[in-house]
Structures are given as C-alpha cells and as structure tokens.
C-alpha cells in the first residue's frame, strides 16, 4: 500500500497532509500556501480551483462556486438550502431526484461533482510533493454529517480518482493531531470546531492503553449549517443596509457588487480579530443616473460582535448537550481545543472560555489540525503507524418508522462504531403480505420530522394474523458511519438488504459518468497546459530574437531581417490559435530563419561560425514560462489587475 494522504475538505478552505516517519507534513500547494480556498470557477472551457478561482470571483460571480459543502447530500426543499439561495450569487437548482444541485451556464452539476474538483487539486498537490501517484485518502467530514452527506463525500472522492479508505469526523481528526504530542497519561478533551460552514463539538477521551494511544469519542453534537459564512452574511447584510440608508440603493440584486461585498466583509472580519476597527472602502460599487456610488463604512470590533453574538451563542447549546450525552461535568474537561478559522474571533474564544471555565489551548493550528489528524489515520490504515486506536461514534439516532408514524430507534446517537444492532418487529394487519422499512436519522419522536435516508420492502410474507410474523431488522454501521440494513422474516428465512442510499444521492451510474467526465476534463486540462507552455515558449523566443535583431542590426542583411520578421509574424499568428502542433512548427521555422543571423553574431564575437542554438537566446524566458505554470499568481495576472482596480 502506498501513502494514504489526509484531506480536510473544508467549506471555506481545504488542506492536505501526509505522515512522514513520526511527523505530519502539511503540504503546500502550487501557490506556496498550506491551505487552498474551496472555490471552483467555470470560465469559458476552463475549470479554475483554489486561489485562481477566488481571484476572478468578482468578475465572474454567477459561475464561481463557494461553500458548496453546505449543499452536499441535501434536498433542494430543505429550509437551510432555501435560505442559502438568497445568500449566494450562483444558481442553486432542483435535480431530478430532488437534491440541491447548482447550475452553471445551463448545465446542472451535483455538489459531489464540484467537490471532486477540490479533491483533485488536493490529490495533485500531494502527488507533486511525493513524486508519485496517490490513489488513497482519508477524508474528513463534520461530526454531525448524516449518512447522505457522508455518502456524497465518498462519491466526491471516487469522482476525483481517490479510494476514500475512511471518512472520519473533523473534531476527532483534530484530537488525533493534538494527541500526537501528548505521549503519556490520560485526558478528556473538548474539541470546539467552528469552520466556514459547519459547527461541531466532540468530547474525546485520550487514554494510554499498553503503550497504545486510544482515542474514544464519548459524545458529539453540532449544527451543519452554522459557520464563518454566516458571520460573513451578517456583516454583508449590515453593509447593504448602511448603503441603502446612505444612498437609497439596494445592492442585493447586483451580483457583482455582492461579490465585492463578500470579499470585503471576509477581509474586515479577519482584520477585526486583531484590530479594534477597520474601514470597508469600495469605490464605484454601483451607479445610478446621478453617477457612481462609493461604499465607505467604518466597522468596530464591538459592532461585529453585536451582529454575530447570536451566532456564537447558538454554539453553546450543542456544547451543553455533548457534555450531558458524555455523562461528564465541565470540571472533567482537561483541555479545550479550538478548530476552524472562525475560532480566531476574540468573541468566540471568550464565550468558549466562559462556558468551559478554562482558556482554550493555542498550540493547535485551527486551519491544519484536521488534515494532520486525517494523515495520522491514513498512516494507521496503511500500517505505517500502529500505536493509535480510534473509537468514533455515530452522531445521530438511527431507526425505522413504526405504527402511528413514530420513530423507533435501532441505534442510539453516540453509539460507538462500527456496530451492528437488531430488533424484531411484526405486521400491523392480518395476512399482511409485505412490510415497508422506512429508515430515518435524527432525534425527533415523529419519524417524518427526521432525515429520511431510504426505504425498502420485504415481500412474500406468508398469510398470518397480525403480530405473529417475526421480522428482524438489523442495522450495520461501518467505520465511515455508512449503513447497511437488512430485514429477515424469521419464519421463512427470506431476507432483503440494502446499503442505505436515500431517495436523493447519486446513483452508481451517475457517479461513473462523472468519473468519465472528470477523466475527460483531465485530458483537456493537460492539453490546455501543453498549449500554455508552447505559447510561453513562443513568446519567449520572439522576445529573444527581436532583441538579438535589434542589437545586431548593423550585421544583418535586409533579406535575413525580412525572413526572420516573417517567421515572427507567422509564429505570433499561430500562438493566437489553439493548434499546439502548428505553434511548434512555426517555432521551428523561426529557429531556421534565425540560424544565419545567429551564425553571424557568434562569428563576429569570435565564437566560431558553427552558429548558436536559438534556444539560448530565450533560456531565461523559457524558465520564466515554467515558473508561470507553477504559479497561479503569474498565470492569472489579468485577475490581479481586476483586484487592483477595485481596491
């Protein structure tokens, strides 16, 4: 087995890590940063991921997808999805199966398909660092993700060309990273994870058992639609209201203005973690008949805190519930670990300290701990690390609908996984020939108030009075938290089983088609990269030859100059088209036309009359071209100019 990488697939940012010996390496991406924005943009025929996608978001808001994780595994009619529709500039559409998808240029895309683009970027980042192909990964999800969301995350990995060996919960992964430096002794930790789109809290017991570190999750709780994006939205709403009050113009309908506001709000929020006040200054945010309008608003830290205090307070309920479910008191917590970028906000740290009665630890990197923990689990699965045992739990109660529409639990929340549990049921009517098993996940007593994961039928039950047939329903949850469910008629031995896939979710055929599409895109991406490289080569060659012609003007005949200039013109024309081979041919033609000139230059310089390799003239230019390929900041200079314009 090769390296199993760890990926934190975040709402706002993603991160990839690998275990090297007894240390975790957080891998820098091509731009040189350790985290990558979880943003995917569709521009012409190109798919941009990460920083390059983020840079062009202002000029391409409708086709730039961010916070896609909040839609993964969700139904279009979910209240939280309907709320999101009014908050994002891109279009959220209803798929044929009722799922929440997105629509780009008239084409519907599933959230796992979009997330796969981010995972591909993480995969490529790891491959570039390791110098070998990577096919296996541990991917993290919010602890409070339900079965549909976990399955959708695995689908995203599959589309990206990854075998997801394990799905683990983000707080658990962070505890693994924290425990790496804690070599001995037992402790109970609370992991408070407030990320870009989700909130989780887990109570985890770390024990030293015969030289092996055992991480046992006692309880977990959270909110899968509460995170930094909501803090941004609160600030954006305030800025929109201030502008409306000042200029009598509503910016809500202007997607370009809203995208600029989003960037400015995120920046202001971050600045206010260290500064007492900051200014949001957006010139030319819009215009009307009276001329251009500018948005200039000064925001204090106290104002931001008043706008978001309710959001921070919402995290306290799950903390209290997690402690109750774990059966421990606040005083039993030895350490509090903060995970997720939003925990850098002073108000969040203050409220957490007040709740737990102790200052949270500052020695765990909130942006990288989750990926580090995933890499540790990857090393455990590959056999590279043998002194760690992870015991996780299922976050939500699992059960089936019984008479009266009641949810009858089969597996209670916070049950350790993997696990298998069974319960015997019977028929509700005389001579009932079949039973329908409807599976739900959640904490409500009324079945249909919970998340329906799926349904299946057990048929051909022999005629019998009600209550007589014995039907055993078994739930089997694997280490990823994904279920297989079976129902068996104990009288006949007839059984029916399924791996739960909700009425929503991607079919196997859809996943396979998306894999094929991704492979086709990979071929297109390579073609695009090769074309960009040969264009860079052409540009560098033209520049070098023109400089040489100018420097040696007195040594070159008119015919030679004309021949070279014709070759340059033909190469410039070819470089504007998309024919890689034609550009190569025109490059060779320029080299041949320039050869007599290079021979004269060398002969005159006393270097002999063999002529020089024209490539030498633009070696530096070629090297610069190669650097451009590895650096999105240079490739996408046009985006940087747009950014400068709006400052």
From Swiss-Prot:
The keyword DNA-binding is assigned to this record: no
Region span, Disordered: 605-647
Induction annotation: By stress conditions e.g. heat shock.
Stored CDD domains: ASKHA_NBD_HSP70_DnaK-like
Keywords assigned by UniProt, alphabetized: ATP-binding, Chaperone, Nucleotide-binding, Phosphoprotein, Stress response
Polar residues bias: start-end ranges: 615-628
UniProt keyword annotation of Cell membrane present: no
Superkingdom, taxonomy of origin: Bacteria
SUPFAM superfamilies the UniProt entry points to: Actin-like ATPase domain (SSF53067), Heat shock protein 70kD (HSP70), C-terminal subdomain (SSF100934), Heat shock protein 70kD (HSP70), peptide-binding domain (SSF100920)
Gene Ontology terms, MF aspect: ATP binding; ATP-dependent protein folding chaperone; unfolded protein binding
Residue(s) carrying Phosphothreonine: 198
Pfam families the UniProt entry points to: HSP70
Biased composition, class Acidic residues, residue ranges: 629-647
Alphabetized PANTHER family for the sequence: HEAT SHOCK PROTEIN 70KDA (PTHR19375)
Protein role: Acts as a chaperone.
Family classification: Belongs to the heat shock protein 70 family.
Name this protein carries in UniProt: Chaperone protein DnaK
Organism encoding this protein: Psychrobacter arcticus (strain DSM 17307 / VKM B-2377 / 273-4)
Gene name of the encoded protein: dnaK
